[in-house]
Amino acid sequence: MHLLRTQPGGFVPDDGIAHLAQTPAELVILCSGDSHLALLAEAARALPDDYPSLRLANPMQLQNHASVDLYVEEVLRHARVILLSLHGGIGYWRYGVEQLVALAERGALLIPVPGDDRPDPELSALGNLPAEQAERFWQYLRQGGLENAGQFYRCLASQCLGRDYAWREPQALPRVALFHPRHAEATLEHWRADWQAGRPVVALLFYRTHLQAANTAFIARFCERLAAQGLNPLPIALASLKESACLAQVEDWLERSDAALIVNTTGFAQSNPEAPELRPFRRDVPVLQAICSLDNRPLWLDNPQGLGPRDLAMHVALPELDGRIVTRPISFKGLAWRSERSESDVVCYLADDERMDFVAELARRWAELARKPNAEKRVALVLANYPTRDGRIGNGVGLDTPAAALNILRALRQQGYPVDGLPASGTELIRQLLGGVSNDLEHLDLRPCAQSLALDDYLACFARLPERNRQAVLARWGEPQQDPMFRDGRMMVAGLRYGLTFVGIQPARGYQLDPAAVYHDPDLVPPHGYLAFYFWLRHAYRADALLHVGKHGNLEWLPGKGVGLSAECWPDALLGPLPNIYPFIVNDPGEGAQAKRRTQAVIIDHLMPPLTRAESYGPLRDLERLADEFYDASLLDPRRAEQLRGEILVLLRDNRLDREIGLQLSDDPDSWLPQLDAYLCDLKESQIRDGLHVFGESPSGRLRLDTLLALLRVPRGDGKGANAGLLKSLADDLGLGFDPLACDMGEAWQGARPACLEERGGEPWRTLGDTRERLELLALHWIERCLGGESPPATWRASGEVLRGLCEQVAPTLDACGGAEIDGLLAALEGRFVPAGPSGAPSRGRLDVLPTGRNFFSVDVRNLPTPTAWRIGFQSANLLLERHLQEHGDHLRQLGLSVWGTATMRTGGDDIAQALALLGVRPVWQAGSQRVADFEILPVSLLDRPRVDVTLRVSGFFRDAFANLIRLFDAAVQAVAELDEAEELNPLAARVRLERQRLEAQGTAPAEARRQAGWRIFGAKPGAYGAGVQGAIEERLWETRADLAEVYLNWGGYAYGAADDGTPARERFAQRLERLQAVLHNQDNREHDLLDSNDYYQFQGGMLAAVETLRGAPVASYHGDHSQPDNPRIRTLKEELNRVVRARAVNPKWIAGMKRHGYKGAFELAATVDYLCAFDATSELIDDHQYALLADAYLLDAETREFVRQHNPQALRDMAERLVEAQRRGLWQEPGAYREALENLLLDVEEE
């Protein structure tokens, strides 16, 4: 060990001996709270020169035995009196407490007191001062303030050191009080005297402890910065917003001051997550969360994540439960001054002027939204555009973004905003936008531009960027005149104004300007054209607020800190302190949280698309009919049965369904027909989307009924009464004796056949799948009848309760969503409070997320993985291991798993729980709080199988939001790696030993070799996001699968763990992937699928491409279906892709739903083609006939082709190009006549 001088803030960066460099003194005061130390150091300034010698220290700086022993030897053994103020109890500093007790036994006076407001009898009993006197010293510290601190010293000298000092008893400070830097007992009148008439009042809430610690300089400074922005500050010190008396007084001051806004610096949450509809404050004003960071400023500047885990929980995640708008850190703990008298560094909260100015300006802009007439407000709607093609404008997952934008514009016009000349439809809106410049470089020079920024104005804005940002842009992109958006001395901006309201196309990220950057530059800085767009919005257009419409744009994913951004972070530098309002799908808390935390967004959550059953169509329906006829004929007409068997075989082979299903066809149909039955039933009952959501509209008619059934299908909450699943309740009421959500669909039905089910459907009733279908139809029938005022049969007790819940709660909340979405958006634009609400997938039992229109929050990361997630993860892990053993004849030992932050938030940590279960490790939760406190290693004898060596590839948002889970999993990995178990039972330990030996043989130091050998968590470069594969595919910057593997490795080759925060580790990442036997990704809901998003092919497809390229051989790939929490399923990735193509992608029902949405519907068809081709490029799992199915359904079907041509002709070209490209690359290996048909179609489209 080596001696190490401690850093301000008590942070000891390694296990060296902390040396406080203090000399002996009569009185030593140890406080685990920096606020107490700062107060006592400040009060010590006023002590007379002859006061006993004094030392102040933080025991948390002395974290190991050697550090404690050194301090005892140098300081404590010489002290006459030792006072210890310890927060959290003896367990937080046990060895140190033991040494203090030993000193007391040798004659020192020991006064241990709690470090907070709660008595600690165990700690207090260790002292040797009478309890009454010890209690008094605790009260001095507990009440705080300079007066009490001064009396504390006087009392200590008098009572414990034999000095002649008069002293007074501790005086209680108010639990809530106004603060004024010039008045000891501030009043509202004191502040009124300072305020400027007509300015909005901003209440500034801060902890009473700052007042108690005399650490108010940063609060006074923030008041000055607020005033500089034209605001009247009203600082309020309080103990806790959860204390009713404190809250009542705060409410009173808010009303009396007519506060326009609240800036809150207190941590945690005021609201109850179970009742988020209860507003934190009665006053209908926004609440901004300003962060008083527990870290020091240099640590924050150097940390690519920004805030540490404690700050993330206290000042970000938990305040989001209250609907607070997350802003920036305004102060940091730091060395304020050196107390020579106590030989201690005084650590206080220090103001950060630049970040304070950001928050103050943001506060002013929110206050202005409430004061400015709507007719004078300038609002800009921003539509995302990626890929950067004209057929893909208006990204918004599950959202008809053009129609949503039009609904928003209409609502604004109705409320008196300056909106004029609106188009008749969303499709027409896009057509008008494409009359001007866009991100499409091919036609850029041929189109007019409706607004632009003069080069001189651009350069003036550019000059205001931080130096590092300016240099990065110039080094990467050169001068702005070289940018494609530069024309005739101006920087062009894509979009149109409707009246004074702007609709713009968000600029491209930059990879289309330099496609090769996708291989080596995951944190690419945005180009000049990107900067010009946001410069124009802020400084030329002078927007009062931005609306980024739909999940999601690219602003919140630009390089920079994960949370607690600095001025050099790109989202901060470009958006600045502008109000950002973000309509966002309710089932994606993770990516919504990214926008909230990096672009101060207020989320207005919206519904997922209407949901429905896939049902049967085309050859699937024909097969179902033939199978039914075969079973009937096999009993009555064997010759007819044989003929039907032949027809079934022909139909199966013609449609390649035998390969999709994996049927082993033989002369005995009994060996494969049940499997066919099960497959057809599974497809028919699959949940798919029926169209898209339109912001501001709830589903109606059939869409409403189908969606309600989807919401009632699985249990909610406790699964009892009205929360039970409707299908299972019907099955129970009818005495069917099975669970329709967890059955073998192909198994013969031997149960009862109630008349009410006999009436449903005209098809034969043979299998459990047929019974499930009849229950679905019965449920839909009674949903409609109950909503029409009828009551179900009195004997239906279980389903009757569910249907009553439907009428009383579920249907009304669904119906309320459309109006609530518009109301929430208008409230935000009027500078009012948008209530918080939970987030999640409604069809997975999360009906508490309805109605939408709220500013959703995510989860308390300290509680993850939850016990429910552990149950699901453990069950899914076992299913995976069983499936692999069954198919490969040996246990799975090496697995790669992709883990996303948004899925972790939705599920409470299914994926991490599954990874821990595979390792053979179980979380340990604290009693009462349910926070994860530790883990325990399960013995191999209990597992009854080998442990699995799991390698994680985490998303960038997971890295930013779940540092605690990274540390938990890393700790579990290292613990398992140290077990003394046989290689065949613990492949992780064996591999770590082998890698360590290899690295040491190459000259790596033993400790470093062990660290690298234990790396099992990899992700993107700090500050960067994504897997990179999309860029390579979109820009067609690849030739072989190995090229895509290279991109995946380059983007993901950074190691994370307790001792690593993005350490470059590409070689180790490749070595890990080369060892894998299988690749897994889980999906937690059915409100989307694998061909709906680029993320699935980037993460799982990319990993599979890398693994198989490195190994030179195929490996297993699995898809975990966690959409029904009580019934997780494991399929191969190929099986899941097959299901998605049949159930959704080429399903006429889904295509018809898209046709209701014009431009965006055609966009969705093109996206499906893109994602299918990309999945094949990465995974090589798409068959030729599946390309043909999409070509037939989208391009060669005359009606669908004409729909696309009319509404989104660019999408028609994009689809034809992509399928022709698939043929050229050999993905679609034998296209036959499709080659000529598609090439001719492409020529026709290009001519048009």
UniProtKB/Swiss-Prot annotation:
Specify the domain of life of the species encoding this protein: Bacteria
CC per GO annotation: cytoplasm
Q: Quick one: which pathway? A: Cofactor biosynthesis; adenosylcobalamin biosynthesis; cob(II)yrinate a,c-diamide from precorrin-2 (aerobic route): step 10/10
Protein name per UniProt: Aerobic cobaltochelatase subunit CobN
Say where the protein is mainly found: cytoplasm
Q: Where in the cell is it found?
A: Cytoplasm
Pfam families registered for this protein in UniProt: CobN-Mg_chel
Mind listing the UniProt keywords for this protein, alphabetically? ATP-binding, Cobalamin biosynthesis, Cytoplasm, Ligase, Nucleotide-binding, Porphyrin biosynthesis
Give the EC number(s) listed in the UniProt record: 6.6.1.2
Q: Which reaction does it catalyse?
A: hydrogenobyrinate a,c-diamide + Co(2+) + ATP + H2O = cob(II)yrinate a,c diamide + ADP + phosphate + 5 H(+)
Q: What is the lineage of its organism?
A: Bacteria, Pseudomonadati, Pseudomonadota, Gammaproteobacteria, Pseudomonadales
Q: Which gene encodes it?
A: cobN
Which GO terms label this protein's molecular function in UniProt?
A: ATP binding; cobaltochelatase activity
- Protein's GO biological process: cobalamin biosynthetic process; porphyrin-containing compound biosynthetic process
What does the UniProt record say this protein does?
Catalyzes cobalt insertion in the corrin ring.
Family affiliation: Belongs to the CobN family.
Under the subunit heading, UniProt states: Heterotrimer of CobN, CobS and CobT.
List the PANTHER family hit by this protein, alphabetically: AEROBIC COBALTOCHELATASE SUBUNIT COBN, MAGNESIUM-CHELATASE SUBUNIT CHLH, CHLOROPLASTIC
